[in-house]
Design a protein with these regions (language model features):
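Transmembrane alpha-helices and adjacent helix-loop boundaries
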Residues: 1-333
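Conserved structural motif at the start of ABC-family nucleotide-binding domains
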Residues: 351-353, 366
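The feature captures the beta-strand-to-loop junction immediately N-terminal to the Walker
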Residues: 379-384
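Conserved Walker
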Residues: 390-391
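Helix-to-loop junction immediately C-terminal to a conserved catalytic motif
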Residues: 397
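Conserved ABC transporter NBD signature motif
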Residues: 405-412, 425
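ABC-family P-loop ATPase nucleotide-binding domains
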Residues: 440-481
Length: 481
C-alpha cells in the first residue's frame, strides 16, 4: 500500500507507469483499453470536483452539468462547425470554465445547504436544457454522428485515431493535468484554496480574497469537467441527456469522497474503483445505488479520509516530531531595528477610529466608539463579555462593515473595505482559536501569510495537527506579523 502511494506521488515513477500503460495498451483487448479510457475520464471528473469541494470547500451536487457542457460543446464544434479535435477540446474546456466562472458569482454568496441546493439546481437546469433543445442536442433521442475513436471516424489533422491511440492521448493529457494540479496545490494559490476551506474569515485576515478563490475554484473545476466531457463525447460517439442527470453528479461526488477529498492521489483510487465497480454489480443493477450508499457509510465511519487516508505514506518529515524546542531566547532574533523605527514614529496615530457604530438587526453592539492606535505602542481593550471588544476588532479588520463612523489607517478611510483588502493594506488580526490548516506543515501555514520570524525552527516541516496547542497558536499569530 505504501508503495502504491509512492508511485502516485513521484513524478518519475508516475511517468514510467504512464509509459508502461501506453505500451501495454497495444497488447490487450480493445474492451480493456476502453475501460482504461473511462478510468482516465473519471479521474479528470474527480480531480475537478476535488478542486472545488475537497480543496476549496465549495460543495457541488450538479457537477454533471459541467460534464455535459463540455461534451455537447466539443461534439457540436466538430460535427456542425468542422472544428479540429484539439480545438474542440479547448472550446469544451474553456466553455465549461466560463460557465463555472459565471456560477461562482451567485454561488459565492451562499454556503453549506444553500450552496448545495444552488449547485443542484444548476445541474438540473443543464439536464433539462439538454432534453428540450432538440435542434441543438438532439433532445431525448440523443446526438448521433459524433466523430468517435470507437467507430474509427475521429481524425486529428488527417490521422485516424483508434481506441488505442485515443487512450494514449488521454494518458498524456492526464499526466500533464496531474503535474499541473500537484504544482498548483503546493503553490501560494493552492494554499489560499486550503485557507478558504478551513476558515473564510481567517483567510481574509491573511489578505486572501475569498471571492477570487471561489471564482478560480469554479473555473478550474468546470474546466476539468468540460475537458472530461469532450473526451467522453468523442470516445462514445453518442450523447443523451440521461448520461448527465442527477445520479451522475452524485456518482462524481461519491467517487471523490471515497477516494479522499483533498487528495490528488485519492481521486485516482476513487475513479478506478467506481469505473470497475458498476461492471461487477451488473447482476445487481437494481441495487447499485444501495451498494453506493453502503460504501459511503463505510467510508464515513471507518475511513473518514477515504482510500487516500488508508494508503497514505508516513510523512518523510516525521523525524522532526522527535525534536525538542530550542530555547526561546535562541529562536528569537534581535528586534532592535524594528523597535527603534517604532520609537521614531511613536507620536503618529496609525489607526484612528472615529465615532464608530455597529448594529446587528437593530441591536447596537458599538455605540460611537473612538480611539487611536499609535506606532510603537500597545493598546489594551478591556471589558466584560458582550461589551463589544471582538466586534470592534472585527470592524477595524474589515470582517464587519460599520453602520456608521470612520476608520482611518495612515490617513485613508478603510471602513467597509473587505477584510482581505484591509489585511493587504497592513492591518491583520489573530483569533482566540488557531485557525490554521491542520494538514499543513508549520512552514506551509506560515507561507499563507507574510513570511516573518516564527521561532518555530525545530518544527518547520511538522504537521500542525500534531504540534502542541501553544505552538499552533504561536504559528498562527506569527503568520500575521
Amino acid at each position: 500500500m505504501k508503495q502504491l502511494g509512492n508511485i502516485l506521488s513521484n513524478s518519475w515513477t508516475l511517468g514510467a507507469l504512464a509509459v508502461a500503460l501506453a505500451v501495454g495498451a497495444g497488447h490487450v483487448a480493445t474492451g480493456t483499453v476502453q475501460m482504461w479510457s473511462f478510468v482516465i475520464i473519471n479521474i479528470l471528473l474527480a480531480q475537478g470536483i476535488n478542486m472545488l469541494t475537497g480543496i476549496s470547500g465549495q460543495i457541488s451536487l450538479g457537477h454533471a452539468g459541467f460534464f455535459a457542457i463540455g461534451a455537447y460543446a466539443s461534439a457540436i464544434a466538430m460535427k456542425s462547425w468542422g472544428v479540429p479535435f484539439p480545438v474542440a477540446l479547448v472550446l469544451a474546456t474553456f466553455g465549461a470554465a466560463a460557465v463555472g466562472l459565471l456560477l461562482a458569482g451567485p454561488a459565492g454568496r451562499v454556503r453549506e445547504f444553500y450552496l448545495a441546493m444552488m449547485s443542484l439546481g444548476f445541474g438540473l437546469i443543464v439536464y433539462e436544457l439538454a432534453r428540450e433543445l432538440r435542434g441543438v442536442t438532439g433532445g431525448v433521442m440523443g446526438m448521433r454522428g459524433i466523430p468517435s475513436s470507437q467507430i474509427g471516424t475521429l481524425q486529428i489533422f488527417g490521422w485516424s485515431i483508434d481506441t488505442v491511440a485515443y487512450f494514449r492521448i488521454l494518458l498524456v493529457v492526464l499526466l500533464v493535468v496531474m503535474l499541473m494540479l500537484r504544482n498548483f496545490v503546493k503553490s501560494h494559490f493552492g494554499r489560499a484554496f486550503y485557507a478558504v476551506h478551513v476558515s473564510e474569515i481567517a483567510a481574509g485576515s491573511l489578505g486572501i480574497s475569498q471571492a477570487a478563490v471561489k471564482r478560480a475554484a469554479y473555473a478550474i473545476s468546470g474546466g476539468l469537467a468540460g475537458l472530461a466531457g469532450g473526451f467522453y463525447a468523442h470516445m462514445i460517439g453518442y450523447l443523451t441527456p440521461e448520461s448527465f442527470g442527477l445520479m451522475r453528479s452524485i456518482e462524481i461526488l461519491v467517487m471523490s469522497i471515497v477516494g479522499g477529498l483533498g487528495s490528488l492521489a485519492g481521486q485516482v483510487y476513487g475513479a478506478v474503483l467506481f469505473t470497475y465497480l458498476p461492471q461487477k454489480l451488473q447482476a445487481f443493477n437494481d441495487y447499485q445505488y444501495i451498494v453506493y450508499g453502503l460504501i459511503l457509510v463505510f467510508i464515513f465511519t471507518l475511513l473518514p479520509k477515504g482510500l487516500a487516508g488508508l494508503l497514505r505514506t508516513q510523512t518523510r518529515y516525521s523525524k522532526f516530531d522527535q525534536l525538542r524546542p530550542a530555547a526561546s531566547g535562541a529562536a528569537e532574533p534581535p528586534l532592535s531595528r524594528r523597535e527603534s523605527a517604532a520609537r521614531a514614529e511613536g507620536t503618529q496615530a496609525l489607526v484612528r477610529v472615529e465615532d464608530v457604530v455597529m448594529e446587528f438587526s437593530g441591536l447596537r453592539a458599538l455605540a460611537g466608539v473612538s480611539l487611536e492606535l499609535r506606532a510603537g505602542s500597545i493598546t489594551a481593550l478591556v471589558g466584560p463579555n458582550g461589551s463589544g471588544k471582538s466586534t470592534l476588532v472585527n470592524v477595524i479588520s474589515g470582517i464587519y462593515a460599520p453602520t456608521s463612523g470612520r476608520i482611518l489607517y495612515k490617513g485613508q478611510d478603510i471602513a467597509g473595505r473587505p477584510s482581505h483588502k484591509v489585511a493587504q493594506a497592513g492591518i491583520t488580526r489573530t483569533f482566540q482559536d488557531p485557525r490554521n490548516v491542520p494538514s499543513f506543515t508549520v512552514r506551509e501555514n506560515i507561507l499563507m501569510g507574510p513570511i516573518a520570524v516564527t521561532g518555530m525552527a525545530p518544527w518547520p516541516r511538522r504537521s500542525t495537527r500534531r504540534a502542541p496547542g501553544a505552538r499552533r497558536a504561536r504559528c498562527c499569530a506569527r503568520s500575521k506579523r
